[in-house]
Regions:
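ADP-ribosyltransferase catalytic core
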Residues: 163-221, 226-246
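N-terminal signal peptide
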Residues: 2-4, 12-45, 274-279
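Internal glycine-rich, Lys/Arg-flanked active-site/core loops of soluble domains
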Residues: 51-200
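Sec-dependent signal peptide recognition
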Residues: 5-11, 267-270
């Protein structure tokens, strides 16, 4: 009995403090995974713009990351503003074209894991401005029609048919199926066939000729329509068909709805109560 209690205690402590995810690809997650920073800033856009962009936080976050700085300034000569946006929106979109993989891994991991509570978000999520600008760009460029896009991944975890999922971070996908099948080594891989209704085509706004790459959001929820084996010539792969379901912002207006000073003690009390139960 004591061993069981000890294991439970270890599990609780691990859940409470070990929030680091797997860097690399944007993971496909069950929608019950609540650690993702999925803020859509509904109802607090102006406050977010002032807090994250005009107050100097963006500059501070840029100064704290050389990778962020490099990607941000790589396409400075491009001034194609999005409708209703500012030059910072364009710069944020260009990050996904010019950032090195190491920085994107760091950013993706932070988005996937730093939404545990307001305290961690406020103190440890160092890309608030970039996250806001990307989400706001998608809102400003709200699509009139949905679009089908694709992503090839090594991730062997296949979601169950009928389940609802989302990506753990922003994710780049390609809308050209023929190009993908001819240029990607798909043997043993997983192909996500994605119908998305909340996306942005960065190429339209960062002076790029690539009009087939789309950027998706961690706030978009998909229903798994089908999971099946497919063949492309002599290459076998798994196709996972995802259809847009809804948008879900678990942490909407995270910085403004409740302060970290309020949320953090509540979270700590709940963890301590659980610990005492097993002692």
């Amino acid at each position: 009995m004591w061993n069981r209690r000890k294991l439970c205690l270890i599990a609780i402590i691990f859940t409470a403090v070990c929030f680091k995810g797997t860097a690399g690809e944007a993971n496909l997650l069950d929608t019950r995974h609540a650690h993702v920073v999925d803020d859509l800033y509904n109802g607090c856009r102006e406050k977010a713009m002032e807090t994250y962009i005009h107050s100097g936080l963006l500059k501070q976050e840029l100064n704290n990351s050389k990778g962020f700085q490099k990607a941000w300034s790589a396409n400075a000569e491009c001034s194609a503003l999005i409708a209703g946006g500012i030059k910072e929106h364009t710069a944020a979109l260009s990050v996904y074209y010019h950032a090195d993989p190491v920085f994107l891994d760091t950013f993706d991991e932070a988005v996937e894991t730093m939404g545990i509570n307001a305290s961690i978000y406020e103190n440890d999520f160092h890309f608030k401005a970039l996250h806001f600008l990307l989400m706001d760009s998608m809102a400003l460029l709200k699509q009139k029609e949905c679009k089908i896009a694709y992503r090839v991944t090594e991730n062997k975890v296949k979601p169950a048919k009928g389940s609802t999922v989302r990506f753990g971070s922003f994710v780049s996908v390609n809308s050209n199926y023929d190009w993908l099948m001819h240029n990607e080594d798909i043997e043993g891989m997983v192909l996500y066939n994605i119908t998305t209704c909340f996306f942005v085509n960065p190429g339209d706004h960062v002076c790029s000729k690539d009009k087939e790459e789309l950027l998706l959001s961690p706030a978009e929820v998909f229903t798994v329509e089908e999971v099946a084996k497919r063949m492309n010539g002599d290459e076998e792969y798994i196709e996972v068909i995802l259809k847009h379901s809804t948008l879900n912002s678990t942490h909407n207006c995270f910085s403004f709805s409740r302060s970290a000073a309020v949320v953090s003690p509540q979270w700590l009390v709940s963890v301590l109560a659980a610990l005492l139960f097993f002692l």
